[in-house]
């Protein structure tokens, strides 16, 4: 007989109840199914309709193409940082933003773990080399903010390194903004059952299974640790120069369209169609740590 498959069942406490979750079981537990959208006090009980989403997104993507023409004509620079828990929808939001932009002038940066050489450098150094030049739009799928979340939670940095990061980051970002880079920082926030449902979907899908790692499974039992680090990060790195934009992302469709609206409304580009952009849903998108309180 072959080696017995490793069990990946975890025990987690949600809402004061101890739950057992086996990600390898093809059946999603009822307690997850019931709250996969409403988890974390999400303000809607239904997802945005597909037809409404498709029409809205297309109009917003037309505006993003205008932004790119404006960047090339003026030499302006835009940089957007996408952060959030695992399975928060960062990649999908980036794709929706980037889909129709010219890849010569719009880049997605998704760095792997640092090399031995990079570990010996100044922490920010490997990120700075990817910052935009004149006319570019750069989107970071995770960023230097790894040091505010996953690294301290999983023990990949020391407490002193984490503390120093929270002090140094506002100074660095202030320099970027003063150098006329348009900097956007997005935190995509999801509920606990939402994350579990998305992990389960990845595990059961032959097309998405590569997205799920053992570290993701380990993170299921560290929800409160990640929450504490999230709150500390938002509190200490939300500044007038480089504010955090928080997006409730249980519904990926609402998250994406409101995130893109925020970018478009903040930029003074030629041909801007205010009616096509529409209004931001203030139940979905807000500013800084107070939005989650």
Swiss-Prot record:
Keyword terms, alphabetized: ATP synthesis, Kinase, Transferase
Top class in the EC scheme: transferase
UniProt GO BP: ATP biosynthetic process
Record-annotated disulphide pairs: none
Domain of life: Bacteria
EC code: 2.7.4.-
Catalytic activity: [phosphate](n) + ATP = [phosphate](n+1) + ADP
GO molecular function, one term: polyphosphate kinase activity
Family: Belongs to the polyphosphate kinase 2 (PPK2) family. Class I subfamily.
Biological role: Uses inorganic polyphosphate (polyP) as a donor to convert ADP to ATP.
Protein name: ADP-polyphosphate phosphotransferase
Source organism of the structure: Agrobacterium fabrum (strain C58 / ATCC 33970)
């Amino acid at each position: 007989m072959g080696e017995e498959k490793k069990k990946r069942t975890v025990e987690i406490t949600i809402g004061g109840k101890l739950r057992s979750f086996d990600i390898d079981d093809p059946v999603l537990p009822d307690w997850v199914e019931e709250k996969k959208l409403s988890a974390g006090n999400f303000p809607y009980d239904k997802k945005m309709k597909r037809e409404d989403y498709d029409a809205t997104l297309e109009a917003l993507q037309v505006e993003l193409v205008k932004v790119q023409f404006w960047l090339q004509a003026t030499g302006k620079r835009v940089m957007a940082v996408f952060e959030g828990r695992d399975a928060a929808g960062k990649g999908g939001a980036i794709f929706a933003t980037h889909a129709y932009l010219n890849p010569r002038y719009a880049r997605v940066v998704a760095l792997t773990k640092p090399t031995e050489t990079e570990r010996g450098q100044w922490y920010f150094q490997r990120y700075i080399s990817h910052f935009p030049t004149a006319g570019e739009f750069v989107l970071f799928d995770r960023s230097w903010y790894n040091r505010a979340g996953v690294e301290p939670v999983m023990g990949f940095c020391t407490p002193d390194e984490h503390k120093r990061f929270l002090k140094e980051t506002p100074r660095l970002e202030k320099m970027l903004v003063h150098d006329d880079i348009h900097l956007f920082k997005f935190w995509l926030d999801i509920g606990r059952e939402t994350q579990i449902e998305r992990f389960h979907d990845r595990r059961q899908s032959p097309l998405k299974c590569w997205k799920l790692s053992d570290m993701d499974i380990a993170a299921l039992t560290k929800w409160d640790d990640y929450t504490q680090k999230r709150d500390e990060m938002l509190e200490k790195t939300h500044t007038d120069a480089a504010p955090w934009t928080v997006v409730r992302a249980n519904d990926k469709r609402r998250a994406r369209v409101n995130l893109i609206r925020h970018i478009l409304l903040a930029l003074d580009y030629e041909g801007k169609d205010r009616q096509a952009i529409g209004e931001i849903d203030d139940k979905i998108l807000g500013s800084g740590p107070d939005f989650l309180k």
